[in-house]
């Protein structure tokens, strides 16, 4: 069994994690996931009741997503107004040992919460606080939790889509399907996160660095489903690639992509997705559609992608969703407008990462580009309905990945 909680901007990430755990064969209790504006937010007592149900075993998996510090978390009711409604690490330790039992022994816990993985030495606390100085990492280790994955810094999300820490933890949940150990699952979740980025931002590197694994990396998680022989880390096409020799381009593999584009309307504006995949989310930039194609080729290494043809249409008067990384509450996040620059500057990117099956390469395509207007924050969203591209390959021994710089281009009319 598994328990997933969340509220405010973490609710969509919690729902994504719950759905992926369910797909992996787990029975998931999602009753503590509160959508923004819920009329009955869950309390600290409700969470403790779910973690330590009377007469029943503690869930084997728990993703308790909330606002944290290193030794307490805020309930959904606390987030809604009662700031005193906390669950402390000391309370959890007491419940875990009640009646001489070890109710958290062998469990797997992970969270999107801020500083939930910050291990603070007891000597730093001192004084009267020394007796209750135990942080989450220390407390859960003493309770014999097998695995605890949490952030040493701020957990970061987005109010309009599943992004940053939310997305990483959802990927981790997906890989807890019995095909990998708990340590491998986090390793490959981070790899898959990086491999799916059309553009890498500082917040991406931050969340990858601070998501910390405590416990036994070789611990395995069993599920109710038939264990897969391999674990799929990323949603992408995986057709075999056979590069051919072009007299001008050398080894190349041509592709034509016709993404299915879907408009999403939110309180913050509009954005599009491609092929039902998560969009490209980059801090302080308009959210863009994104789709991914595996371009892994045996014995060859992709060095870049060359766009050869485009078919597009424009949507005018669009107020885009401009990504503002959220660390506190959705309401406290500043409102950001788009500027008059076009984003993204490049719509195709080759990523190289490690999957459970070995080295993987993907063509990450962002079939959209927004050009803003500074006076009211609206602008033109260009959407690419058809994209022709060639992925260029070299031998693995070739270490030159520097793209050529085009300083000038001229056009000539047809004769």
Where in the sequence are the language-model features?
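Cysteine-dependent hydrolase recognition
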Residues: 1-415
């Amino acid at each position: 069994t598994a328990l997933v909680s969340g509220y405010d901007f973490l609710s969509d990430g919690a729902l994504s994690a719950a759905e992926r755990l369910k797909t992996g064969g787990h029975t998931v209790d999602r009753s503590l996931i509160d959508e923004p504006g819920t009329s009955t937010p869950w309390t600290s007592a409700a969470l403790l009741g779910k973690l330590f149900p009377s007469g029943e075993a503690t869930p084997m998996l728990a993703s308790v997503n909330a606002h944290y510090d290193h030794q307490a978390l805020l309930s959904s009711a606390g987030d809604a107004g009662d700031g005193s409604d906390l669950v402390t690490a000391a309370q959890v330790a007491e419940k875990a040992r009640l009646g001489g039992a070890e109710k958290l022994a062998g469990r797997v816990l992970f969270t999107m919460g801020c500083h939930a993985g910050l291990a603070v030495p007891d000597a730093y606390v001192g004084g009267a606080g020394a007796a209750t100085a135990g942080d989450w990492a220390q407390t859960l280790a003493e309770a014999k939790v097998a695995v605890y994955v949490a952030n040493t810094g701020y957990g970061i999300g987005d109010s309009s889509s599943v992004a940053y820490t939310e997305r990483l933890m959802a990927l981790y949940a997906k890989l807890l399907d019995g095909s990998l150990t708990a340590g491998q699952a986090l390793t490959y979740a981070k790899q898959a996160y990086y491999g799916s980025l059309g553009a890498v931002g500082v917040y991406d590197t931050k969340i990858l660095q601070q998501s910390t694994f405590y416990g036994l990396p070789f611990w395995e998680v069993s599920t109710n489903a038939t264990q897969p022989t391999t674990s799929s880390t990323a949603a992408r096409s995986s057709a075999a690639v056979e590069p051919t020799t072009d007299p001008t381009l050398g080894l190349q593999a041509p592709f034509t992509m016709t993404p299915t584009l879907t408009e999403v309307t939110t309180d913050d504006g509009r954005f599009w997705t491609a092929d039902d995949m998560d969009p490209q989310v980059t801090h302080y930039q308009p959210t863009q559609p994104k789709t991914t194609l595996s371009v892994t080729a045996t014995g060859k290494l992709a060095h870049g992608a060359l766009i050869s043809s485009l078919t597009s249409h424009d949507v005018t008067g669009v107020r885009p969703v401009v990504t503002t990384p959220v660390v506190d509450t959705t309401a406290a996040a500043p409102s950001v407008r788009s500027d008059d620059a076009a984003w993204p500057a490049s719509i195709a990117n080759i990523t190289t990462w490690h999957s459970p099956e070995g080295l993987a390469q993907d063509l990450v395509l962002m079939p959209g580009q927004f050009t803003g207007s500074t006076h009211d924050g609206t602008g033109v969203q260009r959407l690419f309905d058809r994209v022709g591209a060639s992925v260029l390959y070299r031998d693995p021994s070739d270490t030159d990945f520097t793209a050529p710089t085009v300083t000038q281009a001229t056009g000539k009319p047809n004769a």
